Amino acid sequence: MTILDDAISLEERARAYYAEAAGRVTDPSGNKILDLLTKEEALHAEALAKMKDGSYGELAGSTLLQNVRGLVEGAVKKGKDAISSDGSLREILQKAMETEAATKRFYEEKAASADDEKVKDLFGKLARQEASHYLLVSSLAEYFDRPAEWVESAEFGLRPEY
């Protein structure tokens, strides 16, 4: 198995996890976010497969952050909670953070040791995209956990803004 096979396998596992998790979540916003992550990981696997068969051109820029930002902002403007209190979502976001951090490390390590410049470049880009996925998922996890941390009351003092 080559380094590209390992990377494809890693992306496919992440894609499968997000797709399965989307099926477990009852919150519509959480479901949409997991669906966006599923699609993003599928694009990564596709780019890696193209690199493997020699037809790779360029990795398209990610629109994940803009799509999720629009989803959350739209929900907030409508006066709705962007993410509900679906208990399974907390567990899913924690696992997603672990997955994204591990995938980012994998790409950074493999980019550093790659001999092929195209592979090195692709792995560097994928590492940056996985880092942005981690930041997104960790921000969502923090947003989701905020209500559990504090009770909204003047007696508890000032809280950081969401």
Model-derived segments and spans:
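Iron-associated oxidoreductase/ferritin-like identity signal
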Residues: 1-162
